[in-house]
Curated annotation (Swiss-Prot):
<comment type="pathway">
    <text>Steroid metabolism; cholesterol degradation.</text>
</comment>
<comment type="subunit">
    <text>Heterodimer composed of ChsH1 and ChsH2. Two heterodimers combine to form a heterotetramer. The complex interacts with Ltp2 via the DUF35 C-terminal region of ChsH2. The ChsH1-ChsH2-Ltp2 protein complex is composed of two protomers that form a heterohexameric structure through the Ltp2 dimerization interface.</text>
</comment>
<keyword id="KW-0456">Lyase</keyword>
<keyword id="KW-0443">Lipid metabolism</keyword>
<comment type="function">
    <text>Involved in cholesterol side chain degradation. Catalyzes the hydration of 3-oxo-4,17-pregnadiene-20-carboxyl-CoA (3-OPDC-CoA) to form 17-hydroxy-3-oxo-4-pregnene-20-carboxyl-CoA (17-HOPC-CoA), in the modified beta-oxidation pathway for cholesterol side chain degradation. Can also use octenoyl-CoA and decenoyl-CoA, with lower efficiency.</text>
</comment>
<protein>
    <recommendedName>
        <fullName>3-oxo-4,17-pregnadiene-20-carboxyl-CoA hydratase beta subunit</fullName>
        <ecNumber>4.2.1.-</ecNumber>
    </recommendedName>
</protein>
<keyword id="KW-1207">Sterol metabolism</keyword>
<dbReference type="GO" id="GO:0016829">
    <property type="term" value="F:lyase activity"/>
</dbReference>
<comment type="similarity">
    <text>Belongs to the thioester dehydratase family.</text>
</comment>
<dbReference type="GO" id="GO:0006707">
    <property type="term" value="P:cholesterol catabolic process"/>
</dbReference>
<dbReference type="InterPro" id="IPR029069">
    <property type="entry name" value="HotDog_dom_sf"/>
</dbReference>
<keyword id="KW-0753">Steroid metabolism</keyword>
<keyword id="KW-0153">Cholesterol metabolism</keyword>
């Protein structure tokens, strides 16, 4: 599991409007582009879209679901790409890229129909059980 080149199982998540609005509100992000389709379109967007706080949480969930309850996230470096609009699915994939002195590095990519939505590097360690 924690060897360089280990591939994480894919995770597919569908972003319906309820998911997008509820995760924006749960992260206290009240920007209208995340919950008001008319205002998002008026600002040049195709539809409402997922916020970066949700993306960060989903990247963390993806890695910890794979690593298990002993995982301790040390850092997440994240870059956004194309938007994740309502009614699209993001597929998360990942690979272990380094293991050094108990620190595991995982590259994560979330892709949707428009391309790479999020690219992240996650560093984690495993707590002693």
């Amino acid at each position: 599991m924690t060897v360089v080149g280990a591939v994480l199982p894919e995770l597919k998540l569908y972003g319906d409007p309820t998911f997008i609005v509820s995760t924006a509100l749960a992260t206290r992000d009240f920007q209208d582009v995340h919950h008001d389709r008319d205002k998002a379109v008026a600002q040049g967007s195709k539809d409402i879209f997922v916020n970066i706080l949700t993306d960060t949480g989903l990247v963390q969930r993806y890695v910890t679901d794979w690593a298990g309850p002993s995982a301790l996230i040390k850092s997440i470096g994240l870059r956004l790409g194309v938007p994740w609009y309502a009614y699209d699915t993001v597929t998360f994939s990942g690979e272990v890229t380094a293991v050094n002195d108990g620190l595991i590095t995982v590259k994560v990519v979330g892709r949707n129909t428009l391309g790479d939505h999020v690219t992240a590097t996650v560093e984690l360690s495993m707590r002693d059980s």
